[in-house]
Amino acid sequence: MLVYLAEYLTQFYSGFNVFSYVTFRAILGLLTALIFSLWWGPKMIERLQMLQIGQVVRNDGPESHFSKRGTPTMGGILILAGVFISVLLWGDLASRYVWVVLFVLASFGLIGFIDDYRKVVRKDTKGLIAKWKYILQSLAALVIAFYLYASADLVGETQLVVPFFKDIMPQLGGFFIVLAYFTIVGSSNAVNLTDGLDGLAIMPTVMVAAAFALIAYLSGHVQFANYLHLPYLPGAGELVIVCTAIVGAGLGFLWFNTYPAQVFMGDVGSLALGAALGVIAVLVRQEILLVIMGGVFVMETVSVILQVGSYKLRGQRIFRMAPIHHHYELKGWPEPRVIVRFWIISLFLVLLGLATLKLR
């Protein structure tokens, strides 16, 4: 929004032209979201405590988690508010890239909010019924998938980028809708499954978002895109502001979510952030790269699938408990050790993913 004001003021003072640079606005976007989260965080935590909106803890979970019962949750609202304020201030609101991500954040955030509300306010431990949660997620994802496919007017917007192979970029056609759908819904639920320990989900989310900020910048710059054999996507640079806003809001939230957590993000945060990473990957045509960089999310999801499948087919469990972070807790690892080691794995995978941009 402020970019338009700066554009108008440029005629009076050329220094305002600096706001036309994506990198400058991205830095301001990160700082805005970070400062907002740090400033508003204590007030929100206090408000959640007053409303008695506390975490519901599974009785069959690790005993160390029983002490978390009652910790304020739904803190994802803080993250989403920081992202929205930052993007609306510093983003180019004429960009469809911006509005696509904001729609996904809002729609999946609303689904998560309903789920959290039923759990912590209505005291319904099941929350939103899984069937309805999946239906609502599917509707939101399909709306975006069909919109992106129908509005695609460049070849690169529906190509699939295959890491390590610069000359393999198949045209997806209608399969684009299927891939976009599963990427958005899958990423949303994967981050949700990962959000089981203090700070475990938010830090990998920040890392992946930071990596996508770089990729979006490169994809929106014709010379860099051609040099790295990426699809050139005019206007994709505006996604940099969205990604850095997620980074800033996420780091601000981590200040209060780090062990021992003062607040949890809840489904309102995890479902929305996961879906946002998914749709950003779709927009910059890096769905496969998301699997690599978001490997921690993939690992958590696969552990649940294997656990459920093994129990139903063989009557035996592979892990002591799923998702896999609980397995290591039950093996005796202290919670901070599990968290930091998963962060290290995430950092390695993000760097590996970025390396594939050149290793092709």
UniProtKB/Swiss-Prot annotation:
GO terms for biological process: cell division; cell wall organization; peptidoglycan biosynthetic process; regulation of cell shape. It catalyses: UDP-N-acetyl-alpha-D-muramoyl-L-alanyl-gamma-D-glutamyl-meso-2,6-diaminopimeloyl-D-alanyl-D-alanine + di-trans,octa-cis-undecaprenyl phosphate = di-trans,octa-cis-undecaprenyl diphospho-N-acetyl-alpha-D-muramoyl-L-alanyl-D-glutamyl-meso-2,6-diaminopimeloyl-D-alanyl-D-alanine + UMP. Pathway: Cell wall biogenesis; peptidoglycan biosynthesis. GO terms for molecular function: metal ion binding; phospho-N-acetylmuramoyl-pentapeptide-transferase activity; UDP-N-acetylmuramoyl-L-alanyl-D-glutamyl-meso-2,6-diaminopimelyl-D-alanyl-D-alanine:undecaprenyl-phosphate transferase activity. The keyword Cell cycle applies. The chain crosses the membrane at residues 21-41, 74-94, 97-117, 135-155, 168-188, 199-219, 236-256, 263-283, 288-308, 338-358. The keyword Endoplasmic reticulum does not apply. It comes from the Bacteria. Its cofactor is Mg(2+). It is found in: Cell inner membrane. Belongs to the glycosyltransferase 4 family. MraY subfamily. Catalyzes the initial step of the lipid cycle reactions in the biosynthesis of the cell wall peptidoglycan: transfers peptidoglycan precursor phospho-MurNAc-pentapeptide from UDP-MurNAc-pentapeptide onto the lipid carrier undecaprenyl phosphate, yielding undecaprenyl-pyrophosphoryl-MurNAc-pentapeptide, known as lipid I. This is Phospho-N-acetylmuramoyl-pentapeptide-transferase. It comes from Shewanella sediminis (strain HAW-EB3).
